């Protein structure tokens, strides 16, 4: 495909996607291919049953793209698989049609090329999921089939799905791979039902080498008759032929309550792995990697401050960097200080800005008063049981009630490391869930501080 042909076709797809509903675009446009543009005629390969739709709905799109790229009115010649094969047989030569047909992928993978194992930041919270994903990519269909990855939003499940697909495709460019969300699988099912073309859907999904399904919990929410049945049959067809299946979800298979038991059982045939929110060190590593995409200087204390503000998922960290970029560009700032970062992310934080007006010294004083120890003892290294508890509670409350980063909190507690603060925070948080009297004590202290 020439450069102009590529620009023309990209523009056709862009215009079509902007005018059509997503499900309609996926069904009628997504698998079409431009073979060539010659003498102001675009030769487009597509399913024969979709030609009428193109004629009625996309003629203006092609005209617009034609004038933009070629400054001419572009006509269309639609060709189908049978046409290409017949022409090849009759001509007996390596003409453009044969070459184009050979280049047509059997299925559009829909993989995002930016996701790979190399740019996935590993930590203790995702190490097993990464190891399992790499194993599956290295030997698809033989190890951990299916692979079921579950965890909350924004933790990297989609990244791993695409990394698996891209890794397999790199080793085998002819592999038939499909990445799709469960929601889009349902949409395709609905379209094929309405058009009475279920054989086409079966052909598309049951002959894959690798099926990557994102957010499978969406399938459990749907009561449309036949959707789960079709996925069940697709799963069986692939699994029986040793073809790899990878699924992601926001919950374990056992908690997919509206999914048929026979599907849940099959999801547990292979390996189930969990991804949990990244710890502080992993968040620092993620931010250090992500800031390379921005033309700003991020001092280490700013990175650690941001890592301390968002601990639920990676998406929040990425969003925070976008917020900071917007503010920095507006103010024409090159170096992102903690103050600039705090200003930029204030609106993003779900509960608004935390009470930064509360000094850590005030928290230490109230905790010390409650437990009968001094602030000096809380900051020191003495490790008697009553002092250690007071110190850890004070660190917990400093993390809960202020905007200060973990390193900053550690500094206020005698220069302790951020990992010490994180350990104290996690320990008290876990104890609160098991010890009702401790929970009441901490609530009492919080009320006095407020």
Curated annotation (Swiss-Prot):
One biological process term in Gene Ontology = DNA replication initiation
Annotated GO molecular function terms are: ATP binding; ATP hydrolysis activity; DNA replication origin binding; lipid binding
Q: Where is this region: Domain IV, binds dsDNA?
A: 329-450
Pfam families according to UniProt = Bac_DnaA, Bac_DnaA_C
User: PROSITE patterns given for it?
Assistant: DNAA
What are the binding positions for ATP in this chain? Answer: 154, 156-158
Where does the source fall among the domains of life?
A: Bacteria
**CDD domains given in the database record:** AAA, Bac_DnaA_C
What keywords is this UniProt entry annotated with?
A: ATP-binding, Cytoplasm, DNA replication, DNA-binding, Lipid-binding, Nucleotide-binding
Q: Where in the cell is it found?
A: Cytoplasm
Q: Where is this region: Domain II?
A: 77-109
Give the span(s) annotated as Domain III, AAA+ region: 110-328
Q: Which GO terms describe its cellular component?
A: cytoplasm; plasma membrane
- Tell me the segments the record calls region Domain I, interacts with DnaA modulators: 1-77
InterPro entries assigned: AAA+_ATPase, Chromosome_initiator_DnaA, Chromosome_initiator_DnaA-like, Chromosome_initiator_DnaA_CS, DnaA_C, DnaA_dom, P-loop_NTPase, Trp_repressor/repl_initiator
In the record, the note on similarity to other proteins reads: Belongs to the DnaA family.
Q: Which HAMAP family match?
A: DnaA_bact
The record's note on quaternary structure and interaction partners says: Oligomerizes as a right-handed, spiral filament on DNA at oriC.
Q: What is known of its domains?
A: Domain I is involved in oligomerization and binding regulators, domain II is flexibile and of varying length in different bacteria, domain III forms the AAA+ region, while domain IV binds dsDNA.
Q: What does this protein do?
A: Plays an essential role in the initiation and regulation of chromosomal replication. ATP-DnaA binds to the origin of replication (oriC) to initiate formation of the DNA replication initiation complex once per cell cycle. Binds the DnaA box (a 9 base pair repeat at the origin) and separates the double-stranded (ds)DNA. Forms a right-handed helical filament on oriC DNA; dsDNA binds to the exterior of the filament while single-stranded (ss)DNA is stabiized in the filament's interior.
NCBIfam families in UniProt: DnaA
The protein, known as: Chromosomal replication initiator protein DnaA
What does the record give as the organism's lineage? Bacteria, Bacillati, Bacillota, Bacilli, Lactobacillales
């Amino acid at each position: 495909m020439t450069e102009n042909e590529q620009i023309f076709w990209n523009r056709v797809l862009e215009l079509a996607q902007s005018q059509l509903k997503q499900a309609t675009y996926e069904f009628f446009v997504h698998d079409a291919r431009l073979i060539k543009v010659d003498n102001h005629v675009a030769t487009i390969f597509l399913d024969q049953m979709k030609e009428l739709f193109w004629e009625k709905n996309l003629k203006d799109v092609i005209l617009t793209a034609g004038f933009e790229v070629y400054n001419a009115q572009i006509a269309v010649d639609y060709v189908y698989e049978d046409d290409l094969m017949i022409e090849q047989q009759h001509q007996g030569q390596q003409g453009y049609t044969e070459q184009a047909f050979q280049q047509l992928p059997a299925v559009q993978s829909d993989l995002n090329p930016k996701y790979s194992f190399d740019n996935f930041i590993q930590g203790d919270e995702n190490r097993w999921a990464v190891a399992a994903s790499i194993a599956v990519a290295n030997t698809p269909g033989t190890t951990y089939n299916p692979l079921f990855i579950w965890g909350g939003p924004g933790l990297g499940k989609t990244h791993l799905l695409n990394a698996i697909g891209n890794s397999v495709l790199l080793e085998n460019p002819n592999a038939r791979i499909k990445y799709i969300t469960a929601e889009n699988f349902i949409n395709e099912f609905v379209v094929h039902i309405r058009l009475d073309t279920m054989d086409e859907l079966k052909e598309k999904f049951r002959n894959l080498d690798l099926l990557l399904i994102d957010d499978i919990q969406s399938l459990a929410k749907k009561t449309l008759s036949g959707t789960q049945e079709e996925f069940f049959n697709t799963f069986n067809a692939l699994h029986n032929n040793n073809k790899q299946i990878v699924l992601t979800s926001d919950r374990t298979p056992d908690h997919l309550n509206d999914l048929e038991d026979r599907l849940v059982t099959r999801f547990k045939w292979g390996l189930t792995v969990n991804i949990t929110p990244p710890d502080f060190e992993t968040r620092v590593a993620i931010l250090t990697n992500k800031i390379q995409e921005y033309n700003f200087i991020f001092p280490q204390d700013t990175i650690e401050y941001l890592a301390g503000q968002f601990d639920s998922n990676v998406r929040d960290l990425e969003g925070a960097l976008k917020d900071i970029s917007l503010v920095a560009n507006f103010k024409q700032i090159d170096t992102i200080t903690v103050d600039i970062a705090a200003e930029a992310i204030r609106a993003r934080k779900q509960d608004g800005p935390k009470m930064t007006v509360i000094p850590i010294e005030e928290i230490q004083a109230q905790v010390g008063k409650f437990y009968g120890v001094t602030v000096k003892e809380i900051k020191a290294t003495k490790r008697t049981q009553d002092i250690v508890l007071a110190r850890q509670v004070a660190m917990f409350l400093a993390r809960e009630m202020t905007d200060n980063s973990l390193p900053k909190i550690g500094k206020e507690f005698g220069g302790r490391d951020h990992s010490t603060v994180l350990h104290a925070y996690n320990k008290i948080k876990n104890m609160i869930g098991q010890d009702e009297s401790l929970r009441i004590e901490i609530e009492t202290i919080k009320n006095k501080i407020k």
